[in-house]
Regions:
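Thiamine diphosphate
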Residues: 1-170
Protein backbone atom coordinates (compact mmCIF):
# COMPACT_ATOMS: atom_id res chain seq x y z
CA UNK A 1 0.00 0.00 0.00
CA UNK A 2 1.53 3.31 -1.00
CA UNK A 3 0.95 6.62 0.73
CA UNK A 4 -1.48 8.72 -1.31
CA UNK A 5 0.43 11.46 -3.13
CA UNK A 6 -2.84 13.06 -4.21
CA UNK A 7 -4.22 13.32 -0.67
CA UNK A 8 -0.82 14.47 0.62
CA UNK A 9 -1.04 17.31 -1.92
CA UNK A 10 -4.54 18.13 -0.66
CA UNK A 11 -3.26 18.26 2.93
CA UNK A 12 -0.22 20.37 2.05
CA UNK A 13 -2.35 22.85 0.07
CA UNK A 14 -4.78 23.07 3.00
CA UNK A 15 -1.97 23.87 5.44
CA UNK A 16 -0.67 26.62 3.16
CA UNK A 17 -4.17 27.98 2.62
CA UNK A 18 -4.61 28.20 6.41
CA UNK A 19 -1.55 30.44 6.57
CA UNK A 20 0.88 27.88 7.96
CA UNK A 21 4.45 28.94 7.14
CA UNK A 22 6.40 26.67 9.48
CA UNK A 23 6.18 22.91 9.89
CA UNK A 24 8.08 20.76 12.35
CA UNK A 25 8.36 17.02 11.88
CA UNK A 26 10.21 13.81 12.50
CA UNK A 27 10.45 11.53 9.45
CA UNK A 28 7.10 9.70 9.24
CA UNK A 29 5.93 7.28 6.53
CA UNK A 30 2.40 8.63 6.15
CA UNK A 31 3.63 12.24 6.03
CA UNK A 32 6.70 11.75 3.83
CA UNK A 33 5.16 13.44 0.77
CA UNK A 34 3.95 16.43 2.80
CA UNK A 35 7.45 16.84 4.20
CA UNK A 36 8.98 16.64 0.72
CA UNK A 37 6.55 19.29 -0.53
CA UNK A 38 7.46 21.53 2.41
CA UNK A 39 11.17 21.14 1.70
CA UNK A 40 10.74 22.24 -1.90
CA UNK A 41 8.39 25.15 -1.17
CA UNK A 42 10.14 28.50 -0.59
CA UNK A 43 7.16 29.81 1.41
CA UNK A 44 7.38 27.02 4.00
CA UNK A 45 10.06 26.39 6.60
CA UNK A 46 10.41 22.73 7.57
CA UNK A 47 12.26 22.04 10.79
CA UNK A 48 13.30 18.43 11.24
CA UNK A 49 13.10 17.21 14.81
CA UNK A 50 15.07 14.69 16.86
CA UNK A 51 12.00 13.97 18.95
CA UNK A 52 8.44 15.18 18.55
CA UNK A 53 8.26 17.11 21.82
CA UNK A 54 10.76 19.62 20.38
CA UNK A 55 8.02 20.69 17.98
CA UNK A 56 5.98 22.12 20.85
CA UNK A 57 8.75 24.59 21.69
CA UNK A 58 9.27 25.41 18.02
CA UNK A 59 5.56 26.14 17.59
CA UNK A 60 5.59 28.26 20.76
CA UNK A 61 8.48 30.30 19.38
CA UNK A 62 6.77 30.63 16.01
CA UNK A 63 3.62 31.91 17.71
CA UNK A 64 5.57 34.47 19.72
CA UNK A 65 7.26 35.59 16.48
CA UNK A 66 3.90 35.99 14.73
CA UNK A 67 4.13 32.91 12.49
CA UNK A 68 1.57 30.16 12.08
CA UNK A 69 2.94 26.67 12.49
CA UNK A 70 1.88 23.06 12.64
CA UNK A 71 3.46 19.92 14.04
CA UNK A 72 3.46 16.84 11.82
CA UNK A 73 3.74 13.56 13.71
CA UNK A 74 2.53 10.02 14.17
CA UNK A 75 0.22 9.28 17.09
CA UNK A 76 3.12 7.62 18.92
CA UNK A 77 4.86 11.00 18.66
CA UNK A 78 1.85 12.54 20.37
CA UNK A 79 2.40 10.13 23.25
CA UNK A 80 6.00 11.29 23.67
CA UNK A 81 4.98 14.97 23.45
CA UNK A 82 2.51 15.08 26.33
CA UNK A 83 4.86 16.85 28.76
CA UNK A 84 5.59 19.66 26.29
CA UNK A 85 1.94 19.98 25.33
CA UNK A 86 0.84 20.34 28.95
CA UNK A 87 3.84 22.29 30.29
CA UNK A 88 4.18 24.73 27.39
CA UNK A 89 1.21 24.82 25.00
CA UNK A 90 -1.57 24.47 27.54
CA UNK A 91 0.05 26.31 30.43
CA UNK A 92 1.15 29.31 28.35
CA UNK A 93 -1.86 29.27 26.00
CA UNK A 94 -0.03 28.56 22.74
CA UNK A 95 -2.12 27.80 19.64
CA UNK A 96 -0.75 24.42 18.57
CA UNK A 97 -2.02 22.70 15.44
CA UNK A 98 -1.04 19.03 15.55
CA UNK A 99 -1.44 17.02 12.34
CA UNK A 100 -1.20 13.39 13.40
CA UNK A 101 -1.07 10.21 11.35
CA UNK A 102 -3.53 7.95 13.16
CA UNK A 103 -1.90 4.54 13.28
CA UNK A 104 -3.44 1.54 15.02
CA UNK A 105 -7.07 2.03 14.08
CA UNK A 106 -9.30 -0.32 12.08
CA UNK A 107 -7.37 -1.97 9.26
CA UNK A 108 -3.95 -1.57 10.91
CA UNK A 109 -1.59 -4.28 9.69
CA UNK A 110 1.38 -3.54 11.95
CA UNK A 111 0.91 -5.04 15.43
CA UNK A 112 3.35 -2.58 17.04
CA UNK A 113 1.04 0.30 16.07
CA UNK A 114 -2.13 -1.04 17.69
CA UNK A 115 -1.58 0.02 21.31
CA UNK A 116 -0.84 3.62 20.37
CA UNK A 117 -3.96 3.67 18.23
CA UNK A 118 -6.06 2.28 21.03
CA UNK A 119 -5.16 5.12 23.40
CA UNK A 120 -4.85 8.10 21.03
CA UNK A 121 -8.40 9.41 21.30
CA UNK A 122 -8.75 8.76 25.06
CA UNK A 123 -5.45 10.63 25.59
CA UNK A 124 -6.63 13.65 23.58
CA UNK A 125 -9.90 13.61 25.51
CA UNK A 126 -8.15 13.41 28.88
CA UNK A 127 -5.96 16.38 27.92
CA UNK A 128 -9.04 18.35 26.85
CA UNK A 129 -7.73 18.67 23.29
CA UNK A 130 -10.39 19.07 20.62
CA UNK A 131 -9.73 16.85 17.63
CA UNK A 132 -11.20 15.67 14.34
CA UNK A 133 -10.59 12.50 12.37
CA UNK A 134 -10.01 13.21 8.68
CA UNK A 135 -10.90 10.54 6.16
CA UNK A 136 -12.43 12.42 3.21
CA UNK A 137 -10.08 14.49 1.05
CA UNK A 138 -13.01 16.74 0.10
CA UNK A 139 -13.23 18.04 3.69
CA UNK A 140 -9.50 18.38 4.46
CA UNK A 141 -9.15 22.07 3.53
CA UNK A 142 -12.23 22.98 5.58
CA UNK A 143 -11.13 20.96 8.62
CA UNK A 144 -7.58 22.37 8.55
CA UNK A 145 -8.94 25.93 8.39
CA UNK A 146 -11.39 25.24 11.21
CA UNK A 147 -8.71 23.64 13.38
CA UNK A 148 -6.25 26.50 12.83
CA UNK A 149 -8.97 29.05 13.60
CA UNK A 150 -9.91 27.26 16.82
CA UNK A 151 -6.28 26.91 17.92
CA UNK A 152 -5.78 30.64 17.41
CA UNK A 153 -9.02 31.78 19.04
CA UNK A 154 -8.76 29.44 22.04
CA UNK A 155 -4.97 29.66 22.35
CA UNK A 156 -4.96 25.91 22.84
CA UNK A 157 -3.74 22.76 21.10
CA UNK A 158 -6.02 21.25 18.46
CA UNK A 159 -5.42 17.91 16.72
CA UNK A 160 -6.26 16.54 13.30
CA UNK A 161 -6.06 12.75 13.07
CA UNK A 162 -5.22 11.55 9.57
CA UNK A 163 -6.85 8.18 9.01
CA UNK A 164 -5.70 5.27 6.87
CA UNK A 165 -8.64 5.95 4.53
CA UNK A 166 -7.22 9.42 3.82
CA UNK A 167 -3.50 8.71 3.68
CA UNK A 168 -3.24 5.31 1.96
CA UNK A 169 -4.18 4.05 -1.46
CA UNK A 170 -5.47 0.49 -1.22
Amino acid sequence: MPVSVKNSEVLFAALKSAGITLLSALPETWLVHVMQMAESDPDITLIRLNKEEEGVGISAGAHLAGRKSAMLMQNHGLLTSVNGIVSVAQLYRIPLLMVISYRGEMGERDPWQTEGGRITEPLLQSLGIIYRKLSDPATVAYEVRQAQTLAESSLRPVALLLTRDLMWEE
